[in-house]
Swiss-Prot record:
Function noted in UniProt: Global transcription factor that controls the expression of over 100 target genes in response to anoxia. It facilitates the adaptation to anaerobic growth conditions by regulating the expression of gene products that are involved in anaerobic energy metabolism. When the terminal electron acceptor, O(2), is no longer available, it represses the synthesis of enzymes involved in aerobic respiration and increases the synthesis of enzymes required for anaerobic respiration.
Native source organism of the sequence: Escherichia coli (strain K12)
Cofactor binding summary note: Binds 1 [4Fe-4S] cluster per subunit.
GO biological process per UniProt: anaerobic respiration; positive regulation of DNA-templated transcription; regulation of DNA-templated transcription; response to nitric oxide
Name used for this protein in its record: Fumarate and nitrate reduction regulatory protein
Amino acid sequence: MIPEKRIIRRIQSGGCAIHCQDCSISQLCIPFTLNEHELDQLDNIIERKKPIQKGQTLFKAGDELKSLYAIRSGTIKSYTITEQGDEQITGFHLAGDLVGFDAIGSGHHPSFAQALETSMVCEIPFETLDDLSGKMPNLRQQMMRLMSGEIKGDQDMILLLSKKNAEERLAAFIYNLSRRFAQRGFSPREFRLTMTRGDIGNYLGLTVETISRLLGRFQKSGMLAVKGKYITIENNDALAQLAGHTRNVA
C-alpha cells in the first residue's frame, strides 16, 4: 500500500508526478539501492517537469550548473558547437539516464541538451543532491556508479571512432542502442530511431549518405530490416560480430 503522505505529495505536485519507488526506470537511475526512507528524502527534492517538447533545450553551453536531469521518457541529445560554428553531437540519452554530469567539474555546462522527441524529465537540484548524498552513503555510491558508467561510455565512443571503419561504427551504434533498449524493458530487436540519420552521422563522424547506404547494405545482407525510422534486427549474431561483440543482444 502507498503511504498517505506519498499520495498527498502526488496530488500537490500535479498529474505528472511519479514517486521514485514507483518509476519504471528507477533501477537505472539514482533510486537504485536506496531504502524507502532514503527514497522519500530523495523524492522530496525532485521536481517533476512538464513534458519537454521536441527541440526544446534543458540547458545551454555556459549555463551555470543548477540541476541534473533524470530522463523518465523520451530521448535527449547532447552536443557542442565547434569553433567553426558546427554542431557536434556527443551523446544520445534515453530513459533512466542522467544528464548534466559533465558540468560538475567547472560548475558550468560545457554542452547543450536538447529533446529529440517529447520527453519527461525529473529536475534534481544539484547542491541539494550533493548535500543529501553526503548524508546517505548509498546515494553517493549510486552517483559514483552512474558517473563511472558515463565515463565508460565516453571511452567506448573514443575507441569506436578511432579503430572502427564506417560499417563497424554503424553496427556498433545499432547494437549498443538495442542493448540499452533491452535494459529499459523494451524490445532489443525492434525499435524506432528517435534521432535522424543526420544526427547519427554527426555522432559517428559519417555523412548522411554513408548512413543511408550502409543501412541499405545491412538490409540487403539480411542483417537488418529498415522501414523509415523503424529497425528490426534480423541476424543478431552477424550484427554483434560486425560491432565487435560475440554475445547476443537479448
